[in-house]
Amino acid sequence: MNVLPELVKSNYHIHTNFSVCAAKNMTVPYIILQAKKAGLEKIALVDHDHDNWDELLEKTNYRKNEVQEINPDIDVIVGAELSAYGINKYGVDEDTNEQIDFRLYATNHYHLDFWEHPQNKTAPAYAEHTLQILKNLIVSGRADCIAHPFVGFYLRGILDDFTEVTRSISDNELADILELGVQHNVSWELNTKAIYADPIFAKRLWRIGRDVETTFVIGTDAHQIFEIEERKVIELKLATILS
């Protein structure tokens, strides 16, 4: 149910220190402690595949064992943030993909040097490129959820105004891709950092998504402990922006 008081009980996007970009103190015990303080009932630990190409399954299993040893009184999923780095281009093979418990896919990490770019580096071209990646990813069955969808904030060094990317996506195009997600049981992340960066689009995503009965989850994309925010704080912020 897409009701903010329910959605904010969970945080589906938390990195441990197996992600190079995360703080060293992002350990499983510390994360769980902070999540409990924040009033969360469910969290997902999702480290980047591109930081752990050769050891992804080994490291996710290591984290699973840590969680089992702690036996927390909140629900902790160990998944991964995986890469759809181009049209039909994926960072892990199908066998590895199937062994990940929660497959949070990023399609717009354009700041990474291996990511595919459209031939023309314009906002409409990036919008079209991202939509095509998403369409193919969704029908592939690889993804459980899409991380920070559509937003162009990883294009800050290329576009003068990264919000032009989402403005280049029509309401009909947005509805169509969200409906495709519904048909293939793919959820979409309400990524708080993306919402703060592009609030006008966030309102469109929220409105149209609810119209087509999209499944949303909330993630703070936490790389530091303080980014595992209290659920009441997140609810207040999102209610203000999305209303």
What do these predicted regions represent?
Residues E55-Q183:
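Extended substrate/RNA-proximal surfaces in nucleic-acid metabolism proteins
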Residues A197-I200, I225-E229:
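Short active-site-adjacent structural elements
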Residues Q34-A35, L137, G181, G209:
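Generic structural signal for hydrophobic
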Residues A44-L45, L104, A147, E189:
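Conserved beta-strand positions in the central sheet of alpha/beta enzyme cores
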Residues M1-G86, D95, R156-S168, D176-I177, ...:
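An N-terminally biased module of ancient metal coordination in phosphate/nucleic-acid-related enzymes
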